[in-house]
Amino acid sequence: METDIPARLDRLPWSAWHWRVVVALGVTWVLDGLEVTLVGAVAGALIRPDTLALTEQQVGAAATAYLAGAILGALVFGRLTDLVGRKRLFLVTLSVYLVATLLTALSTGFFSFALFRALTGAGIGGEYAAINSAIDELLPARVRGRADLAINGTYWGGTALGALSTLVLLNPNVLPPWLGWRVCFALGALLGISILLIRRHVPESPRWLLLHGRSEEAGRLLRDIEEEVTGRHGPLPKA
């Protein structure tokens, strides 16, 4: 049994491999900031008679549905990530988000809009549960705190992206109102697809594998990581 896996992960110098992990997993905060901003920014468009013709109360209820879905998603997926693994869950939760936000763009009334907002929230809530564990287990302990702070700060990048997107897409001189709000939500799906392609190359957490008695698999994964890092940074220090 390879019991030095945690120490070997912690000794790794910061590398392109770590950047890939941070970008692929840390985008969750960007997506959340984007979604929270979008629903407020498109509210004016959603109450128009030529769009969904929602009331202000229904717009508020849809925002509540998103938050409720996020709480439920965090609880459900948080439990599952310990059972079935980090990688499987962070692929599933991103897929849930991707499909749900795309369906939001195709909503035909209040019920479908609120339902898909709840599912979008569930995907984001599940993302937080799966991603926090994966990031903490894949990054060296010495940089974990700073990395977490930097990643959390990207939430505001998502809000800025949402604000800028709606400023353009909700402009009737750019797109008609019935189409503009739908394209706004479709942006999240496009971003999700690109990130999903990157995440496919992020490995399962060797720490999780070790904890679940799969030490040989954890060792193989870690050797692959070490080989990539060594190719760029030279010999590694002793664990």
Locations of regions flagged by a protein language model:
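Transmembrane-helix signature of 12-pass secondary carriers
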Residues: 1-239
